[in-house]
Curated annotation (Swiss-Prot):
Keyword terms, alphabetized: GTP-binding, Hydrolase, Mitochondrion, Nucleotide-binding, Transit peptide
UniProt gene name: DGP2
Cell compartment(s), UniProt: Mitochondrion
GO cellular-component term (any): mitochondrion
Name by which UniProt lists this protein: DAR GTPase 2, mitochondrial
Organism the protein comes from: Arabidopsis thaliana
Residues spanned by motif DARXP motif: 55-59
Amino acid sequence: MATAKTWKIAREIGDAVIKASRNPNRRWYGPHMAAAVRAISERIPLVDFVLEIRDARIPLSSEYELLRKFSPLPSKRIIVLNKMELADPLELKKCIDYFEERNYLSYAVNSHNKDCVKQLLNFLQSQVRELHKAGHSGHTTTMMLLGIPNVGKSALSNSLHHIGRISAAEKGKLKHTTVSSQPGDTKDIMSLKIGSHPNVYVLDTPGIFPPNLYDAEICAKLALTGAIPDDIVGELKLARLFLTILNSSHEYKKWAKLCKSQDLTESLSDESSKSDAKHKRQYATDHTQDFIVYDVRRVLYETISAFDGNLEDEISMGNLIETQFAALRSVLRVPEEASEFADLRVASKILNLYRTGRLGHYTLEHVSALAKSYTYL
């Protein structure tokens, strides 16, 4: 969110989210969320650890505000930065270093990577051992996973449960919590065993937002990363925000090799079309196929590199984005139709590629912002 243009787009999106949060019929803070707040508040004093799951791309905006009500926190707190595979590695390291310098326990994880989850499990087990050395007398250790919607609590709970049970060579039916790309699917608190000798359980909880949201920039980041339902703002606006961030960054320069030689590009295209024509015909509309993703990266690189306008200027940035949408219709195999509907299809596909890490790694806020906001920890 570094440039003035990005902020203008973010402000429009953020204001829409704030307006929705004040709507009496708002969807993300329904009766189930109010009930979850009560249930979680009652259990926090009873658990041994609180694992606050945050989105590594927005370590500030994905803060779990409910924890501010507990000062000091009765349980040992660990900040887990999930979705590390989607964040800028350098910025992520700065964030981890920031927490460590201030003696805050933190850990970065990719909940879909088995080795990464194993390392987190080992870290958690070491914390359990430290707890027992300090005089914890119980035979069971409990860890409550807390966080806003769609930061990956359920995916992480499942991974810890599966790997923990396998590591302990335990038999029996594995449990599963509901995992979805849509925020708000988890409605109840669920207990999953992740270790034995001593027994260790994680409690997966529903994602919780405050009843009202007030900061437009934070709301825009939450919307872009998928913590808030897309239809509140619209995928078209969100995709434009992402393209603004991409166009203002250096991430696209990593794709230069895709365009080093036009002859090479054409040769690869011809070879691909000959050797894999049947494959392409079958999956031509699947934008997640590698050959389509490469084409998307190439088009984005070419359009940004060829642009000679001022990216700090709102009108110029808008013109570049319009050029990119027009070029992307072809590589994303969007049928010829009314421009508005075609752009909606392009936006949906681009947004998905961004959120799955196919279009680079982005951290939307930096350590300087953390330093201003986390004195209460």
